[in-house]
Amino acid sequence: MNITASKEDYLKAILHLKEKNGYVRATDVAEVLSVKKPSVSIAFGKLAADDLITVHENHQVDLTKAGYDIAAKINHSYETVKQFLCSIGVPEKVAEHDACRVEHYLSQESVVSIGGLVGELSLIHISEPTRH
């Protein structure tokens, strides 16, 4: 199975929508990803063929266990990179954009190391004396 960055984006969007709304529809995914509904239908077909989502008769979608695992991993990478970038002074909107671009290409080892660095940076910021 070939998991492309595009498929990962769809899985992550489905995860977020499910957590936010309790359900996922193609129109919601299209809106989140700024794509047309026919593109979502094609992507859903590919994700279902890869057994990453289940499309129900009412057209709502759920992640399978495999789909959830991939979405959670990508989301963790995104959040870790975003936190790191924000902690070194990158504006939040820029950090969100950049994290979304690199989340697909980092190894788990890199994500763990970046997460450790984020933790160390937060400790440094906490322990810094207030300057007057």
Locate predicted features.
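Basic amphipathic alpha-helical segments that dock to polyanions
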Residues: 40-48
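Glycine-centered, phosphate/nucleic-acid-interacting loop/turn motifs that mediate DNA/RNA or nucleotide
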Residues: 51
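N-terminal helix-turn-helix DNA-binding core of bacterial DNA-binding proteins
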Residues: 2-35
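Append "Primarily bacterial transcriptional regulators
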Residues: 29-30, 47, 95
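Conserved small/polar residues in nucleotide/adenosyl-binding loops
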Residues: 124-132
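Amphipathic alpha-helical dimerization/coiled-coil segments
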Residues: 79-119
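Basic, amphipathic "hinge/linker" alpha-helix immediately C-terminal to the N-terminal HTH DNA-binding motif
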Residues: 59-77
